[in-house]
Design a protein with these regions (language model features):
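Bacterial N-terminal signal peptides that target proteins for export
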Residues: 1-9
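Bacterial N-terminal signal peptides
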Residues: 8-20
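Short, electropositive alpha-helical surface patch
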Residues: 202-218
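Surface-exposed patches in mature extracellular/periplasmic domains of secreted proteins
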Residues: 46, 69-73, 121, 192-198, ...
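A cross-kingdom marker for long, charged
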Residues: 225-253
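Metal-dependent polysaccharide deacetylase catalytic core of the NodB/CE4 family, i.e.
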Residues: 29, 34-41, 88-90, 98-99, ...
Length: 262
């Protein structure tokens, strides 16, 4: 009888120590998702960042043991279809579709072999003065390092549009911005668009519902927190990274602190 009791005690010890710790570790993962915009060597512009600063940030992440993972892997974890992530996992995204992504970001991405998700809005592609072209987007896609996802059709301010349109007009506008832009990207790029970044970080319950109806499985804001399972699928936060933040601020962001200009 004594050997059986000892065996049973060992099994209980394994059950109440190892397993709960594993589950707790998986549940408590916080994922910093970084949001970049335009890369400009001469800086002017509130959302700009020099390529040199970007490279220094990537190098710091690499030197300090961070693993830059594809956004889709983070999404799988947040949705519960992936049980765990590498230690110190972090995600790189870039919004809008600036040509500087091709000119300045691409060489650094290749150098460090890191995955990036681009959130672009079709209205500007091949039309905007400093925007990417469809051919450039395809080149980025073909590197295997860039995943292209949605950022609505015109990058409009939903709060302003809601105030200036009738309820029916606004509903039609939202459908074009979400479902319409999704189809355009899918037709041009031949890939499934399932992720969305909210322009100006603006979202509400109605927009979240419409995004889900349009076929998006997760959407991202710029609410300056680490993403985790406590957030709704259509409002996962990101940290916006700009030149006005010092390296000390960047490090604090990665640690989960709110970003502040220093």
């Amino acid at each position: 009888m004594l050997p059986f009791i000892r065996l049973f005690s060992c099994l209980l010890l394994i059950l109440f120590t190892a397993l709960p710790q594993t589950l707790l570790a998986n549940e408590s993962i916080n994922i910093p998702i970084l949001c970049y915009h335009n890369f400009n060597p001469s800086v002017p512009g509130s959302m700009n960042l020099t390529p040199q600063r970007f490279e220094s940030q990537i190098k710091w992440l690499k030197d300090n043991g961070f693993t830059i993972i594809p956004l889709k892997e983070a999404v799988e974890y947040l949705q519960g279809t992936r049980s765990s992530l590498p230690p110190k996992a972090i995600v790189i995204t870039a919004d809008d579709g600036w040509e500087s992504v091709y000119t300045y970001m691409l060489p650094i991405v290749k150098k460090y072999n890191i995955p990036v998700t681009l959130f672009v809005y079709p209205e500007t592609i091949s039309e905007g003065k400093h925007a990417l072209t469809w051919n450039q987007l395809k080149e980025l896609q073909n590197t295997g390092l860039f995943d292209i996802q949605g950022h609505t059709y015109t990058h409009s301010n939903f709060k302003i549009e809601k105030k200036t349109r009738s309820p029916a007009g606004y509903a039609k506008f939202v459908t074009r911005e979400l479902a319409g832009s999704k189809k355009i990207l899918e037709d041009h790029l031949g890939t499934k668009i399932t992720l969305l970044a909210w322009p100006f970080g603006i979202y509400d319950d109605y927009l979240e519902q419409e995004a889900a109806k349009a076929g998006y499985t997760m959407a991202f804001s710029i609410d300056y927190h680490t993403a985790n399972k406590s957030y709704k699928p259509m409002s996962q936060p990101r940290f916006m990274i700009i030149q006005g933040q010092s390296m000390k601020t960047f490090v604090s962001i990665i640690s989960g602190a709110k970003a502040k200009h220093t």
